[in-house]
Amino acid sequence: MKNYYDYQGHIVCKADERTGNVYVKYKDSMTTVHMPVNTSIKIQRKDTITILTRTTENSFATVSNHYNSYLRYVKA
C-alpha cells in the first residue's frame, strides 16, 4: 500500500500497486476503485485536481495541478 500526494503535499489516496485497488477517503466517505492497467481517475479537492494513472501492473503515476492550471491544459 502506497500513499499518493497532490502538489501541495496532501495525501490524495492510497493504492495497492499489486492488486490495482485505490482507496480514496474524504471526510467520512471512503471510495474504493479497482483500476486496470492504462486507466486513470481524476480526484478533485477544492481547487486541486490530481490525476492518478495505473501505468503498469505494479505502478501508478500522478499529475497534480491547481484547478485553473488544469483548465488551461485541457483547453489547449
Please describe what each predicted stretch is.
Residues 1-30, 55, 63:
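N-terminal acidic leader/helix
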Residues 27-39:
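Short, solvent-exposed S/T- and G/P-enriched segments that are highly enriched in secreted/extracellular
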Residues 36-76:
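Mixed-charge, Lys/Arg-enriched low-complexity segments
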